[in-house]
Design a protein with these regions (language model features):
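Alpha/beta-hydrolase fold catalytic core
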Residues: 1-28, 49-52, 90-91, 117, ...
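Conserved HGGG/HGGXW glycine-rich cap/lid loop of the alpha/beta-hydrolase fold
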Residues: 14-67
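Conserved acidic catalytic loop of the alpha/beta-hydrolase fold
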Residues: 76-93
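Gly/Ala-rich beta-loop-alpha elbow adjacent to hydrolase catalytic centers
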Residues: 97, 101, 105
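Flexible "cap/lid" loop of the alpha/beta hydrolase fold
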Residues: 106-111, 117-148
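Conserved alpha/beta-hydrolase catalytic His-Asp/Glu region
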Residues: 131-136, 147-204
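Conserved serine/cysteine hydrolase catalytic core
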Residues: 183-227, 233
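Catalytic histidine-centered segment of alpha/beta-hydrolase-like enzymes
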Residues: 240-249, 253
Length: 266
C-alpha cells in the first residue's frame, strides 16, 4: 500500500477521495457499501494490483470524501462514480460494488453501456418494496448515532467480538470505516430503490452476481435475474453473510479473478 495514491477528484460537484494502486493496467473500480470506505477493499486490491489499476473511492458522506447536505439517493452516488471515471479518464473499467455499492454499480452500468467492460455485483441491495420499508423503519440510524458516540477502542472491541471469525485486518478496516461514516448517507435507505429488474435488463456487458448463503439476494432472485439477462452469471459463496468479501475473502477473490479473466478474454 505504500506505493498507492491517496488523492481527491472533483466529481459531480463534490470532492471524492480515492485510493489507487496505479500502473498501466486495466482499471477496476471498487465501490463499498453503506458505512464502508474505499480502504475496506485493501486486501482484495493487494491481491489484484499486479494485474489491475485498482481505484477505491470513498462514497459521499463516507471516509475522506465530501459530505453535502443532501443528495444521497442511488442516482447521486451513480453520478459521483460516472464523474470519477471521467475525471480520472479511466478507459473501459470493470466495476465491482458491494451492497449499496452494488446497486450503485448496477445503475452506472445500466447508464454507461459499453463504456464499461463488465460489472460485479456483490450481494447488492436488491430488496423487495416490503423489505425496503422494513429497513427504512428500523433503528439503523439510531444504532449508528450510538456508535459515533463511542470511543475508538470500544468500537474496535465490539467489532472484534461480533466478527471473531474475520481476519483482524478486515475487522479493523470495517470498524474504522464505520466511524468515518456520517449520518447523512443513511438517506439512501429511503424507499424506493431503483427497480433492479429494470437495471439488470438494461446492462449490456458481462455481469457477475455474487451472493451468499445468508445474504440479501436469494438464489431464487439470482436465477430470476439470470433469466432476464443472459450476460449474467451467478456465484454463491457458502458460509457467508451479507459481508461476503469479509467473511470469505479467499473464496471471493477466486470468483472475482475468474470473472475478470473471462471479461479480459471476451
Amino acid at each position: 500500500m505504500t506505493n498507492w495514491t491517496s488523492a481527491v477528484c472533483e466529481a459531480n460537484g463534490i470532492d471524492i477521495h480515492y485510493l489507487r494502486t496505479g500502473g498501466s493496467k486495466p482499471p477496476l473500480v471498487l465501490l463499498h457499501g453503506l458505512t464502508g470506505s474505499g480502504a475496506c477493499w485493501s486486501p482484495l486490491a493487494r491481491a489484484l494490483e499486479a494485474e489491475f489499476d485498482v481505484v477505491m473511492p470513498d462514497a459521499r458522506g463516507h471516509g475522506e470524501s465530501s459530505t453535502p447536505q443532501n443528495g444521497y439517493c442511488y442516482e447521486d452516488y451513480a453520478r459521483d462514480v460516472v464523474g470519477l471515471i471521467q475525471g480520472l479518464r479511466l478507459a473501459a473499467p470493470v466495476l465491482l460494488g458491494h451492497s449499496m455499492g452494488g446497486m450503485t454499480a448496477a445503475v452506472v452500468a445500466s447508464q454507461m453501456g459499453a463504456a464499461i467492460r463488465g460489472v460485479i455485483l456483490a450481494d447488492p441491495t436488491f430488496l423487495s418494496p416490503q423489505r425496503q420499508r422494513e429497513v427504512y423503519e428500523s433503528d439503523a440510524v439510531e444504532q449508528h448515532r450510538r456508535l459515533l458516540s463511542l470511543d475508538r477502542g470500544d468500537v474496535l472491541a465490539q467489532a472484534r467480538d461480533r466478527h471473531a471469525h474475520r481476519r483482524p485486518e478486515i475487522v479493523e478496516l470495517v470498524a474504522e470505516a464505520r466511524m468515518k461514516t456520517r449520518i447523512a448517507p443513511f438517506d439512501v435507505l429511503t424507499p424506493p430503490n431503483p427497480g433492479y429488474h429494470r437495471l439488470v435488463s438494461a446492462i449490456c456487458v458481462p455481469i457477475l452476481l455474487v451472493i451468499a448463503d445468508n445474504g440479501v439476494v436469494s438464489l431464487e432472485t439470482a436465477q430470476e435475474l439470470q433469466n432476464l439477462n443472459p450476460r449474467l452469471r451467478v456465484e454463491q459463496i457458502q458460509d457467508a453473510g451479507h459481508g461476503l468479501q469479509y467473511d470469505q475473502p479467499a473464496r471471493f477473490e477466486v470468483v472475482v479473478r475468474s470473472f475478470l479473466r473471462l471479461v479480459a478474454a471476451s
